[in-house]
């Protein structure tokens, strides 16, 4: 395998310096036309938020059982310039290849969701006036956040009309949203969408169908305080 792109990942409490044990994003295709094992990108987690190193992998499997779009995860031993960095969790990147596996198409727009701390707030507070550009396009075509704006407008209209479910069901996969919220509760995912509107993606089908949610970064699952 040739040269690859590497950068540190993480924010707030999860970021660590290179001399510690950081998380990484790997771009396997950045400098060479290569796709080892069919992959273009891969995320590596050091398990800094999870000493057991099990939550990401178990969370991915349980999300799949709940029919919630999420990445697959496994384990690897990492060496950097010959130095053993120990056990890492490998996480499937959510890119066009992942879209093809999960949604049966590599088309459509995939955004990284904006972080909107929302404990005790109404859900979907991440969609609203002035918030559309907080969503970062990961895959697809730049449409000036028009697809995000459609959900934001429906959210505002639904609250004003008192018809949240009926209005949002036209632009959001509501059964999928319910599965997402139930799975976050079931798994005690205190760092996920269902609790603090964090660590999620949204995907818009190319045919203009309703938006789908997907989970990301599941090392905050299975927390005992949430499961009691």
Residue spans of the language-model regions?
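A short, sequence-level motif marking secondary-structure junctions
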Residues: 4-14, 90-96, 219
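Conserved glycosyltransferase catalytic-site signature
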Residues: 56-60, 72-75, 179, 196-200
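Acidic/His/Gly-enriched intrinsically disordered linker/tail segments
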Residues: 118-132, 209-228
């Amino acid at each position: 395998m040739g040269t690859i792109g590497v950068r540190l990942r993480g924010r707030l409490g999860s970021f660590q310096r290179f001399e510690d044990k950081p998380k990484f994003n790997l771009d396997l295709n950045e400098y060479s036309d290569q796709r080892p094992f069919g992959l273009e990108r891969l995320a590596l987690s050091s398990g800094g938020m999870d000493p057991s190193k099990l939550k990401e992998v178990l969370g991915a499997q349980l999300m799949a059982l709940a029919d919630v779009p999420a990445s697959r995860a496994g384990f690897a031993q990492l060496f950097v310039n010959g130095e053993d960095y120990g056990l890492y969790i490998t996480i499937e990147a959510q890119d066009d290849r992942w879209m093809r596996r999960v949604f049966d198409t590599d088309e459509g727009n995939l955004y990284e969701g904006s972080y909107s701390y929302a404990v005790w707030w109404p859900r979907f507070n991440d969609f609203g006036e002035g918030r559309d550009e907080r969503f970062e396009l990961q895959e697809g075509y730049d449409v000036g956040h028009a697809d995000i704006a459609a959900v934001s407008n429906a959210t505002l209209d639904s609250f004003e009309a008192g018809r949240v479910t009926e209005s949002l069901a036209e632009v959001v996969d509501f059964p999928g949203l319910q599965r997402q919220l139930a799975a976050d509760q079931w798994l005690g995912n205190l760092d996920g969408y269902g609790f603090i509107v964090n660590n999620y993606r949204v995907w818009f089908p190319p045919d203009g169908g309703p938006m789908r949610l997907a989970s990301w970064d599941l090392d905050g699952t299975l927390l005992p305080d949430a499961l009691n």
